[in-house]
């Protein structure tokens, strides 16, 4: 394979992995540890 194709595949895999991790952090098990500043604010 050409070097350019390998670089594109590597960057694509990196982007998909990062997106999956951020979705897991936002909606998965670790989301219970995130704080909500709107919940902490009292009127």
Swiss-Prot record:
Its main location: plastid. GO terms for biological process: photosynthesis. This is Protein PsbN. InterPro entries: PSII_PsbN. The chain crosses the membrane at residues 4-24. GO terms for cellular component: chloroplast thylakoid membrane. The lineage of its organism: Eukaryota, Viridiplantae, Streptophyta, Coleochaetophyceae, Coleochaetales. Belongs to the PsbN family. It is found in: Plastid, Chloroplast thylakoid membrane. It is a single-pass membrane protein. It comes from Chaetosphaeridium globosum (Charophycean green alga). Keywords: Chloroplast, Membrane, Plastid, Thylakoid, Transmembrane, Transmembrane helix. May play a role in photosystem I and II biogenesis. It holds the Pfam family PsbN.
